[in-house]
Amino acid sequence: MNVKSTNISWHRALVDREMREKLLGQNGILIWFTGLSGSGKSTIASELEMRLYNMGRLTYLLDGDNVRHGLNSNLGFTKEDRIENIRRTAEVCKLFVDSGIITISTFISPFKDDRDKVRKLLGKDFVEVYVDCPLEVCESRDPKGIYKKARNGEIKDFTGVDSPYEVPDNPEIVVSTNLDTVQQCVNKILDFLSCKVQE
């Protein structure tokens, strides 16, 4: 990461990550959902968060749309803005993970290079969940009506229509929302996480 300011230094806190995780009784981790719009990322992530909450786990869900209302409100959907959207979000996720929180993020994050940068930043704390769903199924769901707008030319650079989605090469978890129920998808994720979040 290129830091423009040259007169700053990193200050170490007296309370470190290990102490925070011990206090919470859990390990901080980032569960990064990626997939087309309408694939079911937010639905599965919300159910996952509720299940973890009911298990007594401290979580935080960063939804791609919600983050664009605040932190990333000055970004559009050009390739450059999408890259910056993911970069900023990854840095926030890193802070949450360092605080011992099970962090769940739901971003289309269509570019492999961007996701690889998040993986590099988080290291062993990064779990990529690819929400696999055929484009035609996502379009038929179209909960926000945005595929229709994209097909009508009202939205430019829309992932899956006139901007590519690069399928992950080797995600930790793949869930198929056109084949499995939300509960089945969540169970699959929880099975994978069972040994990772336990302190």
UniProtKB/Swiss-Prot annotation:
Chemical reaction(s) catalysed: adenosine 5'-phosphosulfate + ATP = 3'-phosphoadenylyl sulfate + ADP + H(+)
EC number assigned by the record: 2.7.1.25
Gene Ontology biological process terms from the UniProt entry: hydrogen sulfide biosynthetic process; sulfate assimilation
Ligand binding (ATP): 35-42
Superkingdom of origin: Bacteria
MF GO annotations: adenylylsulfate kinase activity; ATP binding
Covalent S-S links between cysteines: none
SUPFAM superfamilies membership: P-loop containing nucleoside triphosphate hydrolases (SSF52540)
Pfam family, one: APS_kinase
InterPro entries assigned: APS_kinase (IPR002891), P-loop_NTPase (IPR027417)
Pathway(s) of this molecule: Sulfur metabolism; hydrogen sulfide biosynthesis; sulfite from sulfate: step 2/3
Keywords attached to this entry: ATP-binding, Kinase, Nucleotide-binding, Phosphoprotein, Transferase
Catalytic-site annotation from UniProt: 109
Family classification: Belongs to the APS kinase family.
Function: Catalyzes the synthesis of activated sulfate.
Protein name according to UniProt: Adenylyl-sulfate kinase
The encoding gene: cysC
